[in-house]
């Protein structure tokens, strides 16, 4: 198998986090991430980008992709849709709390570079979910009843806090922010996975007109299921894999049979999760890969898992990172036109922070870790 990796920029003293990655039609890669003195509380946070020309060894100097001065611009994702429109999604944090996130997007058709794409449109993903407070309260009640005694006090405090926010119209509509790239289904529908830190669950923004207008799916209410990555099975079923944000220590998973409008129960996959982001992609071979921290504690191990049965089992695992310390996390993963798999992730070590890009193939994953 093939594998190569490099840092996108030299280790940097500031906070650099949450990458997106896309392959452009000419074969170059474009990566996005945010940089600043912190996260939601830092008003100097901007969205940066860098390019890797096809066949090149080094990435370009970083350039600005988005900056709303005075506001933190956070989690990024990039996407090239079927019509070759380039999308950048990211949230602007209005009051330095995640619950005030408003997801913005920019589109471009002139993106060959150098530097930032020429943006031709900027908009907001305005969402008005159908009132979900009754359903959420019902699910909270049954979830609480099933909570083991040792976690009961923590769960009660968590649900009390969420309960107060459930009836608030503004909080139901604000705070839905992106992390993983959208999925374009075979019908052409855009499915943008979003999550709320107010409620600690997820929701999809759906567009059937190429992103001109967006509407909210029914929320995926599992309390502690955030940052979904969505993959489509051959039969059209959508599967959402989510970061665990509660006490279960496993990847959360839900399925939709109607293109993301409604979702079944949020369950757990047989994959460990320490409360960190993951991403997945359906390969040209029909196999699926998931890039995730495969521990219950810490982010110093980053794995690629491969499934041959569309996510039912994950028999092959190989590590991008398995270190004693550091954080290697928040991956974004795509497959290029030539079959190469590209994973980009936040790379935090003692000396600073960067994004790391790894390029590999399916054979490399199958071979497993070197002894």
Task: Please tell me what each predicted stretch does.
Residues 1-371:
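Asp-box/BNR beta-propeller blade signature and adjacent active/binding-site loops
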């Amino acid at each position: 198998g093939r594998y190569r990796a490099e840092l996108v920029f030299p280790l940097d003293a500031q906070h650099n986090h949450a990458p997106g990655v896309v392959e452009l039609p000419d074969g170059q890669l474009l990566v996005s991430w945010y940089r600043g003195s912190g996260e939601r509380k830092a008003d100097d946070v901007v969205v940066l980008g860098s390019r890797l020309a096809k066949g090149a060894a080094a990435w370009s100097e970083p350039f600005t992709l988005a900056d709303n001065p005075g506001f933190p611009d956070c989690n990024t994702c990039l996407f090239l849709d079927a019509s070759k429109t380039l999308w950048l999604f990211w949230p602007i944090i209005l009051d330095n709390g995640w619950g005030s996130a408003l997801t913005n997007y920019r589109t471009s058709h002139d993106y060959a570079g150098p530097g930032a794409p020429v943006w031709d449109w900027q908009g907001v993903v305005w969402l008005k979910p159908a009132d979900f407070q009754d359903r959420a309260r019902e699910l909270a009640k049954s979830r609480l009843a099933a909570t083991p005694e040792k976690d009961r006090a923590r769960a009660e405090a968590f649900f009390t806090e969420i309960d107060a926010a459930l009836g608030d119209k503004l909080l139901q509509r604000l705070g839905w922010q992106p992390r993983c790239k959208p999925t374009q289904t075979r019908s052409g529908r855009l499915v943008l996975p979003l999550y709320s830190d107010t409620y600690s669950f997820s929701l999809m923004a759906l567009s059937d007109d190429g992103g001109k207008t967006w509407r909210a799916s029914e929320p995926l209410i599992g309390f502690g299921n955030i940052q979904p990555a969505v993959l489509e099975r051959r039969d059209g079923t959508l599967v959402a894999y989510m970061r665990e944000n509660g006490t279960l220590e496993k990847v959360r998973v839900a399925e939709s049979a109607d293109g993301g409008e409604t979702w079944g129960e949020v369950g757990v996959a047989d994959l460990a999760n320490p409360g960190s982001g993951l991403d997945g992609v359906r390969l040209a071979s029909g196999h699926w890969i998931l890039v995730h921290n495969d521990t219950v504690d810490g982010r110093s191990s980053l794995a690629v898992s491969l499934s041959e049965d569309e996510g039912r089992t994950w028999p092959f695992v190989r590590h991008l990172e398995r270190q004693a310390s550091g954080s290697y996390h928040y991956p974004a993963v795509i497959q290029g036109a030539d079959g190469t798999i590209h994973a980009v992730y936040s790379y935090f070590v003692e000396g600073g922070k960067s994004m790391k890009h790894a390029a590999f193939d399916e054979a490399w994953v199958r071979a497993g870790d070197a002894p």
